[in-house]
Amino acid sequence: MSEIPPSHPRYISLITREKLVQAVHEGIVAYEGLTSHGRGEAFDYLLGEKTSPSGLNAEKLAARVLLAAKHPVLSINGNTAALAAKEIADLQKASDAEVEVNLFHRTDERVKQVSKVLEDAGCVLNKGIVERCIPLPHDRGLCDPRGIGSADVVLVPLEDGDRCEALVKMGKIV
């Protein structure tokens, strides 16, 4: 990892980027995940790099919905695992939600790598059967029918949105 002084005005951003680059080398994050992160960071710049009041309200509402769910599932991709595995483990404990790995650029090896990062952080993973439960023409449609497939609430921390739209059409709260 590069030596980045904490006084640098983009310190958190640069450290985050370095973590993702390292995760690419470890097989956790797909190369395309770096582009996804950059798109998200662009919005962060536009929003002044702080959580807006409406964003904070949305976070609080999401937490209440997750806690009230009958069958909540946290759907985790490589970027989320690389950047927030410990926080996902803490959220799982607080919400009693299942954690399921769901990858757009899916290989058995990446699923194993992402799973290991999450388990090392304390997550208990749903490693059930995988089949196409979500009507999408790519691997994000693959999930466990007893996990994401039957969840009433699915937390999707980082994603472009087509799967979120499909999950909502299936009657899930996303």
Model-derived features with residue positions:
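Proline-centered loop/turn at the N-terminus of a beta-strand
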Residues: 98, 172-173
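Active-site glycine-rich loop that binds ribose-phosphate moieties when present
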Residues: 130-165
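Short, conserved loop/helix-junction motifs that constitute active-site signature segments
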Residues: 92-93, 167-171
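Electropositive, gly/pro-rich neighborhoods at or near active sites that engage anionic ligands
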Residues: 1-100
